[in-house]
UniProtKB/Swiss-Prot annotation:
Signal peptide (UniProt feature, chain positions): none
Subcellular location: Early endosome
Protein name, per record: Coiled-coil domain-containing protein 93
Residue runs in coiled coils: 229-467, 511-580
Record-level GO BP terms: protein transport
């Protein structure tokens, strides 16, 4: 048990792998931006814990730590700090587990994955914050300022919008034809849609003003599976004829909008002229009929393109049907393969989990074997080997006994058969029974001996388990040191509470005295002011009270100065002890280095001379 006021040293693993991991951790922290890890005067614990705290705060997570750096912390303070760090890691969804004693014991092999993950998370958070701050700065800049390109755009915007609206107004859809008032009403929706498109000069997307296509452009690419089929051609011809009749019927019921709007009706002409109304009406109707016939003849030129589109749609529809069937078949095969793949993945995950479980058990057994005492372990191995050999001998003996018993049983059966024939079985039967009893007793003795040996092995194994190993003793020592630190911290805190209580109690007593004095002055003031003698006596009493208060105050000031001097003296002693402690640690380190050099020189001197 370490003496009070001294900082106990914790046993740490100082092998090559731990040193390599520490160097990698420091390189990661420096690369991430934690340059305090370069300071050579800091201990590895301060560098690692400081780097972890810096990464956690960079990731915008709160951690309850002391902002003021304190060198040579006690075991209790280190445990409290590591527990706070470990409690924050699950909140950050860290995939690696870490215990406080691993950080305190400087187990860099287990600390390295956590540091690696924290550095990666800190860099990602810093990049996200940089992007956010950059976008926020750009938005604030655009709110207050504008670029020359934006100013030019605002100047040209109004003119551009006006030009665009005029262009849209010029090229907007215009009605070129209109159904006549006396035409029959269309019943189905497709005919109404087709009629409306024809009124605006469009036939399935082809404008009236477009030039007729060339014969080679009108050729429809026929799929490979439809070449040379007469039924498709006949169907296309029928569709073409039906479409031509349909368009012709629709166009005969329409008239040009400009002609109809510019035409004067018979009633209007009669009202204006007042004579020959019938002749004018007849001429106007004849003119309208001629105009409709001419417009119908003009539209006949564009019927071929629509029928060609119909044929293309029919051929492509059949090709789409074939492709859909093929797609359904491929989807069924894909679903079957997907289900098989899912089962295979499930089996793979089961096998992988089983392998991981076996690896974990094997690593636990290897760890236990490395921590155990070599001599006790070798003795236990010898006993286990002896037990295994005895078991093997028992199995061999049992197999031999079974073979011997079967052979003897065969002999008995043969002898019984021979005895029944010759009548000489009694003596042989008795001899065999005696031999059987002897072998049975021998087997029972061997079983008792084996049970006694197994019991001795179990007793020795329990005794071995009761003896603590070196690792367990080290763990007990660490725990006792931690408990001592916690007890000392609790004692210090309790002492502070007692001091605070005594201070507050003294303050309460002085306040009560002050209140009683003020109440007494208030009660006797009127009576003392009634006569001069009473007033003089009252003033003398007040002067005596003030003198007493001054004396008490001087005593307290003197006591305060004494305590302050004592505190300064203790602080100086504490600083001297700290300096001695630093010198002690430095001397121990130099002594270890000299011992290492001495061992190196001795090993070189003992080496074989050439």
């Amino acid at each position: 048990m370490a003496a009070r006021g001294e900082t106990p040293e914790v046993e740490t693993r100082e092998d090559e792998e731990q040193g390599v991991k520490l160097a990698e951790i420091l390189e990661l922290l420096v690369a991430a931006g934690y340059f305090r890890a370069r300071i050579k005067g800091l201990s590895p614990f301060d560098k690692v814990v400081g780097g972890m705290t810096w990464c956690i705060t960079t990731c915008n997570f709160d951690i309850d730590v002391d902002l003021l750096f304190q060198e040579n912390s006690t075991i209790g303070q280190k445990i409290a700090l590591t527990e706070k760090i470990v409690s924050v890691l699950p909140k950050m969804k860290c995939p690696h587990r870490l215990e406080p004693h691993q950080i305190q014991g400087l187990d860099f092999i287990h600390i390295f994955p956590v540091i690696q993950w924290l550095v990666k998370r800190a860099i990602e958070t810093r990049q996200e914050m940089g992007d956010y701050i950059r976008s926020y700065s750009v938005s604030q800049f655009h709110k207050e300022h504008s670029l020359p390109e934006d100013q030019d755009f605002e100047l040209r915007r109004e003119k551009t919008v006006r030009t665009l609206s005029e262009t849209l107004d010029v090229y907007r859809p215009r009605r070129k034809y209109k159904r006549q008032g006396g035409s029959s009403e269309l019943m189905d929706e497709e005919s109404r849609v087709h009629s409306t498109l024809l009124e605006y000069g469009r036939r399935y997307g082809l404008s009236k003003q477009m030039k007729p296509e060339k014969p080679e452009d009108r050729r429809v690419p026929v799929p490979q599976g439809l070449v040379g089929k007469g039924e498709v051609r006949e169907e296309e011809e029928e569709l073409r004829a039906e479409e031509e009749l349909r368009i012709k019927a629709l166009m005969t019921e329409m008239a040009a909008t400009g002609m109809e709007e510019g035409r004067l009706t018979a009633s209007t002409v009669g009202q204006i002229v007042g004579l020959q109304s019938k002749e004018i009406k007849q001429m106007v109707s004849e003119y309208a009929e001629k105009q409709s016939e001419l417009s119908a003849e003009d539209r006949a030129e564009y019927l071929g393109a629509a029928q060609q589109h119909r044929r293309k749609v029919a051929s492509l529809s059949k090709l789409i049907g074939q492709r859909k069937k093929l797609l359904d078949q491929l989807q069924e095969k894909a679903s079957e393969l997907q289900s098989g793949c899912g089962e295979t993945r499930k089996q793979l995950t089961e096998v992988t989990s089983h392998m991981e479980k076996l690896d974990q058990e094997l690593s636990v057994l290897e760890n236990m074997e490395s921590k155990a005492d070599p001599s006790v372990l070798q003795k236990l191995r010898d006993l286990v080997a002896q037990n295994e050999s005895l078991k093997a001998q028992e199995q061999q003996f049992r197999s031999k006994c079974r073979e011997e018993m079967s052979r003897l049983q065969q002999n008995i059966d043969g002898l019984k058969a021979a005895a029944t024939e010759h009548g000489e079985e009694k003596e042989q039967t008795q001899a065999f029974e005696q031999q059987y009893k002897a072998e049975r007793e021998k087997l029972q003795k061997i079983r008792l001996l084996l049970a006694r040996r197994n019991r001795e092995i179990a007793i020795l194994q329990r005794k071995i388990d009761e003896v603590p190993s070196r690792a367990e003793l080290t763990q007990y020592q660490k725990r006792f040191i931690e408990l001592y630190g916690q007890v000392s911290a609790t004692h210090k805190e309790t002492k502070q509470f007692f001091t605070l209580y005594n201070t507050l109690d003294d303050k309460k007593v002085y306040l009560e005295k002050e209140v009683n004095l003020l109440n007494s002055i208030h009660d006797n003031f009127q009576q003392a002011m009634a006569s001069p003698s009473a007033r003089d006596q009252f003033l003398r009493q007040m002067e005596q009270i003030v003198d007493g208060i001054r004396q008490s105050r001087n005593k307290m000031e003197k006591k305060k100065q004494e305590n302050k001097m004592k505190r300064d003296q203790l602080n100086d002693e504490y600083l001297e002890l700290l300096e001695k402690q630093r010198l002690y640690f430095k001397t121990v380190k130099e002594f270890k280095e000299e011992c290492r050099k001495n061992e190196t020189l001795l090993s070189k001197m003992k080496g074989p001379t050439p």
